[in-house]
Amino acid sequence: MSSGKNGKNKSQPAKAPEEEPKNAENSEGEAKKPELEELPPFEVVEGSRIPASSFKFQFKNVEYSSGRNKTFLCYTVERGDDQVFRGYLEDEHVAAHAEEAFFTNVLPQFLSSGPASVTCYVSSSPCVNCAASIARCLRRSKALKLRLVMARLFQWEESEIRGALRGITSAGCQLRMMKSADYVYVWKNFVEPDIVLDDEGIAEQPGEQGDFIPWEDLEENSKYYEEKLAEILR
């Protein structure tokens, strides 16, 4: 988040070119900074399907993630009664984040009736505060099995962030980076075609959702982040 998530801006410190994913985008610092404008009130958006263009942009696993100033969280909750629940949240602006909203307000509704296995696919790894919320949820709910699958690592060079990620795993969460198969799964289960307007501004009937087409270097960037995550969790 641009000033949330402890200053959660998806841009990260520049490093030597050989250490960067090959399709890294320009950092925000390279462009002229726009004038600051007042942001509308914060909100967490909840739904079942993400527009395809939003998914492709927000979940792209580049390192310099200019413009990606929000977090998307797609969740699957499986309970012992063979019920499966899916949905997604996205946050706006600078207050609570999607992770905190999910683990504080959404997930407890599913934990009142017994054990649950939860997988969250997030566009970026959690900030320090959200990591603390996740750890608290795990410690309160011993019957919760949690897996967090991340497209990118947020400010992974910061010692507080590294410690927060280790704290999540110590609390019982499985952390890993998204791979091609995960993108295909999320595309199939959480993404919908973009709304297209005709010449009169009326929404056209959406067509069928096509197959997920990976961007260049998706798998290579995933391996890059896997190595960084492994370093953090040692």
Question: Which residues does each PLM region occupy?
Answer:
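Zinc-dependent deaminase catalytic domain
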Residues: 1-234
